[in-house]
Curated annotation (Swiss-Prot):
This is Peptidase T. Zn(2+) 2 binds at residues 142, 177, 381. It comes from Streptococcus pneumoniae (strain Taiwan19F-14). Keywords: Aminopeptidase, Cytoplasm, Hydrolase, Metal-binding, Metalloprotease, Protease, Zinc. The gene is pepT. GO terms for cellular component: cytosol. Pfam families: M20_dimer (PF07687), Peptidase_M20 (PF01546). Its cofactor is Zn(2+).
Amino acid sequence: MTYPNLLDHFLTYVKVNTRSDEHSTTTPSTQSQVDFATNVLIPEMKRVGLQNVYYLPNGFAIGTLPANDPSLTRKIGFISHMDTADFNAEGVNPQVIENYDGGVIELGNSGFKLDPADFKSLEKYPGQTLITTDGTTLLGADDKSGIAEIMTAIEYLTAHPEIKHCEIRVGFGPDEEIGVGANKFDAEDFDVDFAYTVDGGPLGELQYETFSAAGAELHFQGRNVHPGTAKGQMVNALQLAIDFHNQLPENDRPELTEGYQGFYHLMDVTGSVEETRASYIIRDFEKDAFEARKASMQSIADKMNEELGSDRVTLNLTDQYYNMKEVIEKDMTPITIAKAVMEDLGITPIIEPIRGGTDGSKISFMGIPTPNIFAGGENMHGRFEYVSLQTMERAVDTIIGIVAYKG
């Protein structure tokens, strides 16, 4: 189905810079997200028909569309995030390419281009309307496509009371891209049986497995002396960091793994001979494998300290989120419904693990099972990001189908 306001909603949202800041100590991490929620989303939520609309100190804008059929007793939530990734988001100037011809798309005057030779996903979209960047910013389809789709679904249901639906709760939240947005989510206030994050990629994505995730911060303490007299005295902290890294499995890196394979990812190294710090992220799907990865890092640190004769390697491990499959597989109702709705719409569900996490990873462990459904974005987090308007329309169809489902 086509929705005349969907594109306008989306273009309005992406033009607002809501980039999050991992170094901030506030919630939300940037004032622009507060302004976007209170000045753009809250008025829009009221206009499209949501009731009891409010903004919480945790950064979430919340609203409700009451059920219009007493036989539909479920309460279902839909959640998308306001922030965008760590890439230029100031001055987003979207290009709307109607009836895409399958060829190269010039991204404004930037000199960058979307070429099917480089981005095979473009081969799916001839004849469709694509929204791209102008090459100077990201687009923000992650996750403003989700916000636009939820808003459009509510708008359509309000205008078409003949479509019977259950109670719907909507939540637009902050800071998903920096991994802290759902930390303060109020599950008791949201009060639904289950929810969906509308934060996936291409048409048909339906996901209920995520990584389990941890961060590892390492400190290597060296001893700096003049290199001319260093023998037997110098301890090079940079070399300690190299030695530690070389003891990790060389093939367990993001660029060499796929599917259900986990990894260690060296994110950052800074330092000198005297003192060096390294940051890793650890990812795996199975709980035992996840715990084994953390234990392996600790074992390497302990072994190095034993060989060095002092505690020169300090490891601090912090769990970040867990595989939501552990919660959702206890009651697959949200998956069963979404899968049935997609199939009824002629959409082939793509049920694959997320090699990452969503707000749903944390919200599921707060008592609200929250799988993820497609929002349409491709090449997210950079200048080559784009989205198909037709895929966004199908996401709206899916949301409407879920809340009207009577099975």
